[in-house]
C-alpha cells in the first residue's frame, strides 16, 4: 500500500496514494521519502521524536530540502540501527561541510543535490532553452513573466 501525508490534500493525490496522518505514516512505513517544501511546519520533521515513532529498520530518503532533517538525530538513528539506511540528495548546509555528521554514517548515501539531473530532465531543459532562443530570434516571447 502506498500512503502519503500532506497538509494540502488534493484529488490528484488521492489517485496515487492513500492520505494518512503523519503519525500513522511514520509507524507503518518501511520507506519514507521526503518530497516537500521547506516551511516552518516541515523544518526538522525528521527528528528524534518522529524517528522514535518509526518502524525499526526504516529507510529514509530526502530529495527535497536539507533542513527537513535534523542531521544529528538521523545520524544517531542510523548508528543505533533504528534507521537501517538513508539516502540524501540535500543537506542542511550546501555545499556539504567537512564536519557534517552524516559523512561519518556508513549506512548513508549522500549525493550533491543532483537527483533532478536525470538524462531526460537535462534533455528537456536543453530543448526548452533552444526553443526559447529560437522564439526570441523570431521576435516572440515565451514564458514571459513581466507582462
Question: Residue ranges of each PLM-predicted region?
Answer:
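Short, hydrophobic secondary-structure boundary micro-motifs
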Residues: 5, 86-87, 143-147
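C-terminal helix-to-coil terminal segments
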Residues: 92-147
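Rossmann-like adenosine-cofactor binding region
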Residues: 7-101
Amino acid at each position: 500500500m502506498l500512503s502519503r501525508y500532506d497538509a494540502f490534500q488534493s484529488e490528484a493525490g488521492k489517485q496515487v496514494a492513500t492520505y494518512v496522518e503523519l503519525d500513522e505514516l511514520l509507524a507503518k512505513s518501511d520507506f519514507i521519502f521526503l518530497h516537500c517544501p521547506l516551511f516552518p511546519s516541515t523544518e526538522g520533521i525528521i527528528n528524534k521524536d518522529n524517528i522514535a515513532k518509526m518502524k525499526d529498520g526504516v529507510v529514509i530518503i530526502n530529495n527535497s530540502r536539507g533542513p527537513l532533517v535534523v542531521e544529528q538525530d538521523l545520524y544517531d538513528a542510523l548508528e543505533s540501527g533504528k534507521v537501517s539506511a538513508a539516502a540524501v540528495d540535500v543537506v542542511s548546509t550546501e555545499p556539504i561541510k567537512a564536519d557534517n555528521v552524516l559523512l561519518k554514517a556508513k549506512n548513508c548515501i549522500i549525493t550533491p543535490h543532483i537527483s533532478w539531473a536525470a538524462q531526460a530532465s537535462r534533455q528537456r531543459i536543453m530543448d526548452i532553452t533552444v526553443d526559447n532562443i529560437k522564439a526570441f530570434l523570431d521576435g516572440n516571447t515565451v514564458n514571459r513573466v513581466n507582462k
